[in-house]
Amino acid sequence: MGAHHTATEQSARLFADACAVIPGGVNSPVRAFNAVGGTPRFITSANGYWLTDADDNRYVDLVCSWGPMILGHAHPAVVEAVQRVAADGLSFGAPTPSETELASEIISRVAPVERLRMVNSGTEATMSAIRLARGFTGRPKIVKFSGCYHGHSDALLADAGSGVATLGLPSSPGVTGAATADTIVLPYNDVDAVEEIFEQVGDQIAAVITEASPGNMGAVPPEPGFNAALRRITEEHGALLILDEVMTGFRVSRSGWYGLDPVDGDLFTFGKVMSGGLPAAAFGGRAEVMERLAPLGPVYQAGTLSGNPVAMAAGLATLRTADDAVYAALDKNADRLAGLLTDALTDAGVTHRVQRGGNMLSVFFTAEPVGDFATARASETWRFPPFFHALLDAGVYPPPSAFEAWFVSAALDDEAFDRIAAALPGAARAAAEASRPA
């Protein structure tokens, strides 16, 4: 247990091959390991909590495909559902019963959601929700928060977290001033800033969008009452509240963050868990708002593969398998991981905070509470790469960025935690011995 896994020859070869045909060798930037250095691991299979790479190294997975795999990988119920549906056809470009089934399942869990539209990614979900909010209110401006990531559509990439934070970019080349001219970015968890901007231009604001509990600047949960304050302010000014639950939805509880902090958004966005790891997402909300979408209303949104039957089957199987025992296991496993992290880093004398957003968590190398993007960026992020690589070499796979949340699955067992516990002291020492860049 805790043996080092340093062979990366096959992953290095595959990465070189990928770089010849794919920009940067990856299809999402964080996978390239730019934030931590080294060779990105090319995964060839996964089962339960185990990942296996091209060099036959095995890792305890603490990324879970960036959240969706709450049951663990290749869960039999999900695999069987996908195989059964795939045998009847992969895509039809026509309505299917499973779209209605999954929409009904989601609506039954999140009370403010009365209607739901399927899309193919979280980016599509938030982009479409913004368009709908503008179409419904007739107003142009959107308020978002620094460090909250809502996908890579132009209007929402301003001062985002996730990969943009990893790359150290304020936005992205190719995002024009015109695209973000109506995007107002405020500090997260700052109710006064929200009040002030609504006093100034409230009659122009279509919506406030926020991650229900952010995980893209690390796990930085809302201060108690923050989301409720957003609800109050938007209602007072006739704006909509969009709660982005792409990450938290059906992970932190069977009703997502709404189950922990029941604030009635006008619109919600979902992804990740809702499709069991296949590419699908959704946005939904009040019927009055959603029925402005085509074909009922004038706000256009469409997608050739939206509501794909295989993705719908994976989502239904995941949600229906995730019973109370699964959510209890997720919370218990997050508690256990947080305790091991705290003990190891404390024993090594490393100043740190382990922060939680439900069963999502992050390690910040700072003594200060992290309540916004500024404090997240002010932490000693240079300690993270050696911490990460020590864990990776010991067969534990954490997120390859200091600005991403860690995710547990219900599949984790004593063997998994024994490996994590064996790996952490060395990783904590590596963090303690890290040198601040010149």
Curated annotation (Swiss-Prot):
InterPro entries: 4pyrrol_synth_GluAld_NH2Trfase (IPR004639), Aminotrans_3 (IPR005814), Aminotrans_3_PPA_site (IPR049704), PyrdxlP-dep_Trfase (IPR015424), PyrdxlP-dep_Trfase_major (IPR015421), PyrdxlP-dep_Trfase_small (IPR015422). This is Glutamate-1-semialdehyde 2,1-aminomutase. It is found in: Cytoplasm. It catalyses: (S)-4-amino-5-oxopentanoate = 5-aminolevulinate. Its EC number is 5.4.3.8. One of its GO terms (biological process) is protoporphyrinogen IX biosynthetic process. GO terms for molecular function: glutamate-1-semialdehyde 2,1-aminomutase activity; pyridoxal phosphate binding; transaminase activity. It holds the Pfam family Aminotran_3.
